[in-house]
A protein has these predicted regions:
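Sec-dependent bacterial lipoprotein signal peptides
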Residues: 1-12
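Conserved functional micro-motifs across diverse proteins
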Residues: 10-152
Length: 152
């Protein structure tokens, strides 16, 4: 009897479990998640400038948004912001200096709810971004401060 039950239990299918994705830093609210991960510069561009006095530090910025927008004008404004305006809402604090990104490029074709972009800062050689600040001028994220110097 025991062998029959053991044999039957091995054939039962187990529902697949989705692994929870962990990010360097993330903040969430109902139906939305904003996250940040480090990104290898070679994915986006060169590691350093031509003179060699500065280096690039890249981050992957993700926005998962399941809020449905039905107004066509609002959709257009949102797209314009995500592609062109969001870059200017980011600031890196590096050794007490505030730096704006030099480049932001969206990853194409990720699906309706997920948007990811490579965000690149030019920093002095050997320096790291201590903090990234996001001041949302479009939506309702407000000001988000991502302290990175304690996260290695």
């Amino acid at each position: 009897m025991f062998l029959i039950l053991a044999g039957l239990s091995c054939r039962q299918r187990v529902a697949p479990v989705e692994a929870e994705v962990r990010h360097l830093v993330s903040v969430s609210k109902p139906k939305e998640v904003l996250y940040l991960d480090r990104l290898d510069n070679r994915v986006v561009m060169a590691r350093e400038d031509t003179v060699g006095q500065t280096m690039f530090r890249s981050f992957l910025v993700g926005l998962r948004d399941s809020v449905v927008v039905t107004d066509a004008d609002r959709k257009r404004e949102r797209e314009k912001y995500l592609q062109y305006g969001m870059q200017q809402d980011w600031t890196a604090v590096v050794g007490g200096d505030s730096l704006k990104p030099v480049f932001m490029q969206e990853k194409p074709n990720l699906g309706g709810e997920l948007r990811e972009s490579a965000l690149v800062f030019e920093v002095p050689r050997g320096a790291e971004a201590d903090t990234l600040v996001y001041r949302d001028t479009y939506g309702d994220w407000g000001t988000q401060v991502f302290v990175l110097n304690a996260i290695k």
